[in-house]
Design a protein with these regions (language model features):
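Conserved SAM-binding loop of SAM-dependent methyltransferases across substrates and taxa
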Residues: 87-101
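Conserved SAM/SAH-binding beta-strand->alpha-helix loop
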Residues: 112-114
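A short, conserved alpha-helix within the catalytic core of class I
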Residues: 166-178
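Class I SAM-dependent methyltransferase Rossmann-like catalytic core
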Residues: 27-77
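Conserved class I S-adenosyl-L-methionine
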Residues: 77-86
Length: 322
């Protein structure tokens, strides 16, 4: 398949999802995966450096402090697959700890080509680590990785940060069950979960005063303009972060500041929006410390360890397949 043909297929999928989301009855929405084009991926890396966004620092601290302990608790894997690797900087701690024990194959699985390229640059030269990247949806990439290994080799799946929080709770359970279906006894999953905190602390993490998160969210409209020929006026929308206490999640929206009409030729769509109406772009569900154990059981795993950061309540949870 030529790169041009592949790009056309991506744009076609994008157009279909944009059309479906913006015509959805009740609440317009767009899939959060489309936030992460090249510009969005760079903006997200900037978000991770913000003082208000403590999640990435907590994630990294736990891996830095406990990498050897994490590796010691899991059946030693020959293969490591990471769902949504990003730049891969924090994963270095685990791979270096693992490389002390054996030659390892590392497979970053990303939908963002820019993030995948950054990861390959960051981790491609590690001693005793062979890197093979997959630009695929998570489950498709994981199935491809599982097909590569020998029968006796163990596989560890990394799902770090709080990406699981982007799924609503039933969808998270369903996704984790599908991950389990790919795995074999002796395989493991290291899952990051962000815990509930003071509401104002949580809101600041998703609506920083500098405006980086706002730019990240608004870039989705700019992407639709670039790739689908739309005429969204970014100044006519604002970034909105809300705490949904009933669902225990942060919601990111783009709110229309006036009554307006937007043409999206690439999706064969004309959108009419009222002042105050929103487009829901992302959710981040928060958890309580006991919940990962229950999630593991529902998905067919057993949790054998949990490491919690005290500065920013966040956990790495180690699950195994028995």
């Amino acid at each position: 398949m030529s790169s041009q043909t592949a790009q056309q297929l991506v744009l076609s999928d994008f157009a279909v999802d944009v059309r479906a989301g913006l015509t959805k009855p009740g609440q317009r929405e767009l899939p959060s995966k489309y936030l992460y084009d090249e510009v969005g991926s760079e903006l997200f890396e900037a978000i991770c450096l913000l003082q208000e966004y403590g999640l990435t620092r907590a994630d990294t601290r736990l891996l830095q402090r406990h990498a050897n302990e994490i590796i010691a608790r899991m059946p030693l894997p020959a293969h490591v697959a990471e769902l949504g690797s990003g730049s891969g900087k924090k994963t270095r701690y685990l791979l270096e700890a693992l490389a002390c024990h054996r030659q390892t194959f590392y497979y970053p699985i990303e939908i963002s080509p820019a993030a995948l390229a950054a990861c390959e640059k960051e981790l491609g030269q590690l001693d005793c680590v062979s890197l093979v990247g997959y630009e695929k949806p998570y489950l498709e990439g994981l199935r491809a990785v599982a097909a590569r290994r020998e029968a006796q080799d163990h596989l560890c799946v990394l799902f770090l940060g709080s990406t699981i929080g982007n799924f609503d709770r039933p969808a998270a359970d369903d996704f984790l069950r599908q991950v389990r279906e790919v795995l074999e006894p002796g395989d493991s999953l290291l899952l990051g979960t962000d815990f509930e905190k003071d509401v104002n602390v949580q809101l600041l993490a998703y609506d920083d005063p500098v405006g980086v998160t706002a730019a990240f969210n608004l870039n989705l409209l700019a992407r639709i303009n670039r790739e689908l020929g739309a005429d969204f006026r970014l100044r006519d929308f604002r970034h909105l972060a809300l705490w949904n206490s009933a669902e225990r999640r942060i919601e990111m929206h783009l709110q229309s500041l006036r009554r307006q009409r937007v043409n999206i030729p690439g999706a064969a769509l004309l959108v009419r929006m009222e002042e105050g109406e929103t487009i829901w772009t992302e959710s981040s569900h928060k958890y309580r410390p006991h919940e990962p154990v229950e999630m593991a059981a529902r998905a067919g795993f057993r949790q054998i360890a949990q490491w919690v950061d005290e500065e920013w309540p966040f956990a790495q949870n180690l699950w195994i397949v028995e």
